């Protein structure tokens, strides 16, 4: 598994439906980039200029919404993950 550093977070991307309600299969070019996922790993937090470590506000297991083009996409063991900074997360969904 990936271990993020600092204020970085590893997100498991939530897949969207590939067909419409009417049964039409969407080609790859018609799909929107996902903006939600599940937190699977968090870093230790950012360090301030005074040397104080500030813990992250999100936790493993949180369902989050993030900026559309944020982070770096990686594949590990066939699973898609996104590594992004805490500041790229817009909200935690309940």
Curated annotation (Swiss-Prot):
Q: Does the keyword Chaperone apply?
A: yes
The record ties this protein, via CDD domains, to: cpn10
The free-text function statement in the UniProt record for this protein reads:
Together with the chaperonin GroEL, plays an essential role in assisting protein folding. The GroEL-GroES system forms a nano-cage that allows encapsulation of the non-native substrate proteins and provides a physical environment optimized to promote and accelerate protein folding. GroES binds to the apical surface of the GroEL ring, thereby capping the opening of the GroEL channel.
By its UniProt entry, which SUPFAM superfamilies does this protein fall under?
GroES-like (SSF50129)
Q: Please provide, alphabetically and separated by semicolons, the GO molecular function terms listed in this UniProt record.
A: ATP binding; metal ion binding; protein folding chaperone; protein-folding chaperone binding; unfolded protein binding
Assembly, in brief, is: Heptamer of 7 subunits arranged in a ring. Interacts with the chaperonin GroEL.
Q: Where in the cell is it found?
A: Cytoplasm
- What InterPro entries does this protein's entry cite? Chaperonin_GroES, Chaperonin_GroES_sf, Chaprnonin_Cpn10_CS, GroES-like_sf
One GO cellular component assignment for this chain's record is: cytoplasm
Q: Does the keyword Cytoplasm apply?
A: yes
Origin organism is Exiguobacterium sibiricum (strain DSM 17290 / CCUG 55495 / CIP 109462 / JCM 13490 / 255-15)
What is this protein's name?
Co-chaperonin GroES
Per the record, the similarity remark reads: Belongs to the GroES chaperonin family.
User: Which residues form each disulfide bond in the chain?
Assistant: none
Q: Name one Pfam family in it.
A: Cpn10
Q: Which UniProt keywords apply?
A: Chaperone, Cytoplasm
Q: Which GO terms describe its biological process?
A: chaperone cofactor-dependent protein refolding
């Amino acid at each position: 598994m990936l271990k993020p550093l600092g204020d970085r977070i590893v997100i498991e991307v939530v897949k969207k439906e590939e067909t419409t309600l009417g049964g039409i299969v969407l080609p790859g070019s018609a799909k929107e980039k996902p903006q939600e996922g599940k937190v699977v790993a968090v870093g230790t937090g950012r360090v301030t200029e005074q040397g104080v470590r500030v813990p992250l506000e999100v936790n493993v297991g949180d369902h989050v919404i993030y900026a559309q083009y944020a982070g770096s996409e990686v594949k590990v063991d066939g699973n898609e993950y996104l590594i992004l900074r805490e500041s790229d997360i817009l909200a935690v969904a309940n």
